[in-house]
Amino acid sequence: VSPERLALAGEFGASRALDARDGDTAARLREGGALDCAFEAAGSQASLDAALASLRKGGELVLVSLMGEVRLDAFDLVNRELRLLGSVGYRDAYPELIALLADGRLDLARAVTRSVPLEQAVEHGFEALLRDKSQVKVLVNPNPALADA
């Protein structure tokens, strides 16, 4: 997690943005009480474990990252009556967010730290995200000429 991403989370309204490398993330998330809902967006086993451990009984975990195989304690899920939901961001999954964007009440332009044409997506897009942790989101534009129109 980069300082830029943590700061941006606060700018977008997160009440807390934590760096998982700074100690017991689950305990820090539970300060003031366990969570009703957690979103796992980092794509690591450690962040998944922290998100699950931060939930109250009956809480919900939404997985929005892609991470391949993970370990889950099925007994814990059942015993604590947790709900697990996977989401890949289809248009009708976020109607409130889309309305905020359409009305101009939410500007996500600050999250886009780089824009690259499609033919440079790997070298200047994905590899930049891996090398430069200050990058937040890279926009891959299949037709840059339309962006200038």
Predicted regions mapped to residue ranges:
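Short glycine-centered segments of the SAM/dcSAM-binding site in methyltransferase folds
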Residues: G59-E60, R83
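Short glycine-rich anion-binding loops that position phosphate/pyrophosphate groups of nucleotides
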Residues: S44-Q45, M67-G68, A145-L146
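Helix-to-beta-strand junctions that scaffold the AdoMet/dcAdoMet cofactor pocket
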Residues: L55-K57
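Residues in the short beta-alpha loop(s) of Rossmann-like NAD(P)-binding domains
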Residues: V1-S2, M67, Y90, N143
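Glycine- and other small-residue-rich loops at beta-strand/loop junctions that grip anionic moieties
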Residues: L18, D36-A41, V64-L66, G86-S87, ...
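Adenosine-nucleotide cofactor-binding segment
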Residues: V1-A50
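Rossmann-fold NAD(P)-binding glycine/threonine-rich loop
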Residues: S65-L82, D92-A99
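C-terminal hydrophobic helical "lid"/dimerization subdomain
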Residues: D49, R91, E96-A149
